[in-house]
A protein has these predicted regions:
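Broad gene-expression machinery/nucleic-acid interaction feature
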Residues: 7, 16-20, 51-53, 71, ...
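Generic structural signal for well-ordered, non-membrane alpha-helical segments
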Residues: 12, 29-33, 37, 65-72, ...
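Solvent-exposed alpha-helices and their adjacent loops that cap or buttress functional pockets
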Residues: 13-15, 29, 45-49, 65, ...
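Catalytic alpha/beta core of large soluble enzyme barrels
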Residues: 13-54
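Short, structured patches in soluble enzyme cores that scaffold and shape functional sites
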Residues: 22-25, 58-60, 100, 134-136
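Catalytic cofactor-binding cores of redox enzymes
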Residues: 51-83, 88-93, 101
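Accessory "access/gating" subregions that flank catalytic or transport cores
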Residues: 79-186
């Protein structure tokens, strides 16, 4: 009596595939991190990341605040990914330094030295790669029921004969071909 029997459970998962999404060049001044990820999802689809872990790379992410990077990585799940990451750099180190639960002094120096080894090696192979020009990205708005249904503000809602697309527009009270510029945002 008094014995506790422990059982172990495990979740069997396949090793995730790797995907790199690179956004290079100069962003329009009004573009925010959420616009970037909505643009990527609108181009690749909400299932593009299924079974993948996504690395976001390129100048658009390198120049982004830590909070913006968190937005991007958090929304990687909206494209079906298991997770997202952006290589640690000085922005990361500055963000961590001085935080309440961050390592202090020598311990922080050691952590930063290790974190500097984590970025992907030059020439690394990915299961899939996607490249976007930052200049093509503008503020985005979604018109449907998932983040893949997005257009640049000022563009029209596309047309489609797909039943789920039509159902989504009906649910949102919108019509294909309508210009999003004059639509109220709710």
């Amino acid at each position: 009596h008094g014995r506790i029997r422990r059982q172990r459970q495990m979740c069997i998962r396949d090793r995730p595939k790797s995907m790199r999404v690179t956004v290079s060049g100069n962003l329009h001044p009004s573009v925010q991190p959420k616009d970037i990820i909505l643009y990527v999802i609108s181009k690749l689809g909400t299932d593009a990341g299924t079974g993948h872990f996504v690395e976001f790379a390129g100048t658009a992410f390198e120049q982004m605040s830590m909070e913006g990077r968190m937005t991007i990585c958090n929304m990687s799940i909206e494209m079906g990914a298991r997770g997202g990451m952006i290589a640690p750099d000085q922005t990361t180190f500055d963000y961590v330094s001085g935080r309440e639960f961050a390592p202090k002094e020598e311990a922080l120096k050691q952590k930063i030295a290790y974190w500097k080894t984590l970025p992907t090696d030059e020439g690394a192979a990915f299961d899939s790669e996607h490249h976007f020009d930052a200049a093509d990205i503008r503020p985005m708005i979604t018109y449907g029921t998932n983040p893949g249904m997005g257009v640049k503000i000022g563009e029209t809602i596309p047309t489609s004969d797909d039943a789920s697309f039509i159902k989504s527009l009906n649910y949102m009270g919108l019509k294909a071909g309508s210009n999003m510029l004059h639509m109220p945002i709710s």
